[in-house]
Amino acid sequence: MKWLVLLGLVAFSECIFKIPLRRVKTMRKTLSGKNMLNDVLKEHPYRLPQISFRGSNLIIHPLRNIRDTFYVGNITIGTPPQEFQVLFDTGSSVLWVPSVLCNSSTCSIHVRFRHLQSSTFRTTNKTFWITYGAGTMKGVVAHDTVRIGDLVSIDQPFGLSMAEYGFHGRRFDGVLGLNYPRQSCCRPTPIFDKLKNQGAISEPVFAFYLSKDEQEGSVVMFGGVDHRYYKGELNWVPLVKADDWTIQVDRISMRREVIACSDGCDALLDTGASFIHGPGRLIDDIQKLIGSEPRDLKHYISCSAVNTLPSIIFTINGINYPVPAQAYILKGSTGHCYTAFRAKRVRTSTESWVLGDVFLRLYFSVFDRGNDRIGLAPAM
């Protein structure tokens, strides 16, 4: 039987598992400073991750945000614990970190898991690979104790990266996937599912508050919701299918004119994506409407446009979610401003979008596995 939403979702901070997040400088800014951005973006256009394999408490975990739009937090793996900085990602489902056996140049600049130093480690003969927009990793499935704040998952399956290609300038060690599990004979159980199954969290929900602050204030919470992080009421949106954090969008408009998604479209809410991604033709139309100019794989615009351009409104389940110009116009390290709209390079049979951190900073988001839906409300 579905659990009672009104009692289960609203909780007070003393009953919460809160995990702090940090906002880290994106690969884009790192590469811009090294004059490497254009080459990398041509080689690795945005696409969703593709993966192949051969209690009653609410935990709120802080995340960190450094200068741009990736939000990372700390976890530990092993006994004694080894600490890693990971991206909490609703667009993928696997937890992985680099192995000490990985000799790729990308692995060498990150914290690597030393399996021989953990008394609770065990390996398997299962291998896998994951392709993200920015690169590919290959690894093996292993098991060990994983801790997210006060949450503990014993004998948790996770990936150990043995080789990494791409990922230039990555500012986090690994990824903690929070999407639905993918059906495969060899795929490890996602950590959220294992925590849920072993009763470590009382309700099958997690939520994100992504602060606009450059460093502190962002959190991911497990097992319920702290209502102090949002204003008003949560508006619930059913998932398109109970296997992915994708919802239906009614339309996208500006100045009361529909500019995209005229017949409805799908949108993935992806904490692992920095921007708002959509079909190339429609993104180009939006860039023209707001007056941006393409240059070096970005669309630049006058910084003063934040004071004159209207909001772009995503209507979801009958509710309007404005994205103001102050959110979709970003200032780079050189002082020039550019837009937060990006074209998806992988074509799909239907119109689909990705609502990344530009959208999620504006709206507190609750991911409800118990009822296969997402809750949205204006963030505090």
Swiss-Prot record:
Glycans are attached at residues 74, 125. PROSITE patterns: ASP_PROTEASE, PEPTIDASE_A1. GO terms for cellular component: extracellular region. It is an enzyme of class 3 (hydrolase). Keywords: Aspartyl protease, Disulfide bond, Glycoprotein, Hydrolase, Protease, Secreted, Signal. One of its GO terms (molecular function) is aspartic-type endopeptidase activity. PANTHER family: BETA-SITE APP-CLEAVING ENZYME, ISOFORM A-RELATED, PEPSIN A-5. Belongs to the peptidase A1 family. This is Pregnancy-associated glycoprotein 4.
